[in-house]
């Protein structure tokens, strides 16, 4: 069996275990690998993907059962931080990383996303990803401060019949405060995605404490 096939089978087993642990639903795990790869492995991101170096930092917010961060870490060469505030989920992710032989290029950080943005990783990430993390405003405020200029923030989008419904979720004026600008929008046939580029350093007032973010979102 090819190494790539072995890795794929390991990922499937890990996602099955995530279901049994209550970290993923059956539907999320079913297409989890392909859905996760859709964040980066598309024609819209081909040049960005090719520019990745081993020293580059990517961060996945609220990795939970492994989507998309664990999958993307498996198929990319850069260094990944997988974040989650749950001790139990972090223990699961650490075991998964070991099973996939990713210890040298992946680290699990047990903390909230806004806490991470206030530390040493602020302004360091070339890529930040999030899936079903929170509302657009909350997710953007947690992601924006982590990005370096030129870095990308990529999210998966819920299904909508009308594309403008998704557009309204990410108002330009709200993103400007975080130094973000919409870059691309694409659909793989399985799911839709949206990327934002960091065009300016995020203001030092962000992120706010989580209770303030939720009570008074930017948009």
Predicted regions located by residue number:
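Class I SAM-dependent transferase core
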Residues: 1-59, 88, 95-101
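Conserved SAM-binding loop of SAM-dependent methyltransferases across substrates and taxa
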Residues: 65-77
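Conserved SAM-binding motif I beta-strand of class I
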Residues: 79-84
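Conserved SAM-binding strand-loop segment of SAM-dependent methyltransferases
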Residues: 102-114
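A short acidic, Gly/Pro-enriched loop at the edge of an enzyme's catalytic core
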Residues: 114, 118-127
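A short glycine-rich, Lys/Arg-flanked "PGG" loop and its adjoining helix->strand segment in the class I
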Residues: 138-150
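Conserved beta-strand signature within the Rossmann-like core of class I S-adenosyl-L-methionine
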Residues: 150-161
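SAM/dcSAM-binding transferase cores
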Residues: 166-219
């Amino acid at each position: 069996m090819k190494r790539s096939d072995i890795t794929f089978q390991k990922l499937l087993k890990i996602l099955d275990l995530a279901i049994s642990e209550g970290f993923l639903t059956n539907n999320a795990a079913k297409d989890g690998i392909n859905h996760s790869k859709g964040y980066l492995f598309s024609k819209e991101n081909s040049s960005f993907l090719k520019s990745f170096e081993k020293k580059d930092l990517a961060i996945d917010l609220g990795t939970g059962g492994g989507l998309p961060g664990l999958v993307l870490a498996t198929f990319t060469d850069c260094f990944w931080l997988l974040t989650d505030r749950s001790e139990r989920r972090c223990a699961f992710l650490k075991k998964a990383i070991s099973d996939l032989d990713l210890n040298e290029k992946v680290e699990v950080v047990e903390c909230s996303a806004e806490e991470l943005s206030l530390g040493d990783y602020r302004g360091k990430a070339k890529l930040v990803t999030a899936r079903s993390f929170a509302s657009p405003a909350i997710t953007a405020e947690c992601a924006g401060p982590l990005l370096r200029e030129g870095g990308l923030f990529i999210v998966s989008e819920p299904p909508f019949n009308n594309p403008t419904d998704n557009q309204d979720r990410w108002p330009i004026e709200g993103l400007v405060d975080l130094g973000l600008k919409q870059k691309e929008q694409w659909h793989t046939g399985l799911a839709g995605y949206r990327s934002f580029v960091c065009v300016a350093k995020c203001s030092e007032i962000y992120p706010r404490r989580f209770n303030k973010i939720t009570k008074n979102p930017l948009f």
